[in-house]
Amino acid sequence: MTNNALLIIDVQKGFINEYTRELPGKIEKLQNNYANVYAMQFINLEDSMFRKQLNWHKLSLNTQDTELAFKIRPDALVFSKYSYGATPEFIEYLQQQGITSIDVCGQSTDCCVAKIALDLFDNRILPKVLADYCASTTGRLVHKRALISLRHIIGKDNII
């Protein structure tokens, strides 16, 4: 833990597989080390590019797939998102709260974790990616490669 704020990205039932199944339990415990906990929850809208271009239809609105795969703290704030990245509203909220650095965990390291880390970085909020609390649905090798890339892009000291 390097901050008093934790961002949990897309740890949802529809993303749990053989590569990510241990993540919910680890994050459920981890969240208790923070004063402020935020979660991002992906929803695949009917007109999304995920459907149109990738023919990917999971995590539709109001389905069990979109539910968080762990018991989140009652005082945590959950933000919906409809793409790989952070919403402008979420970034603005963090800025209004005076948050300048935040620990980041979740899935998938190579997609949403990386994109949101870059969104935070671009908006002058320093992401600290907790490598052992991230995973990729496509496997450990992809997770490791994403961490290598993030070390270069946001700084080696920001991957913990």
Ranges and model annotations:
Residues 9, 40, 131:
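Active-site flanking residues adjacent to catalytic metal/cofactor-binding acidic residues
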Residues 11-18:
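Short acidic, Gly/Ser-rich segments with clustered Asp/Glu that frequently serve as metal-coordination loops
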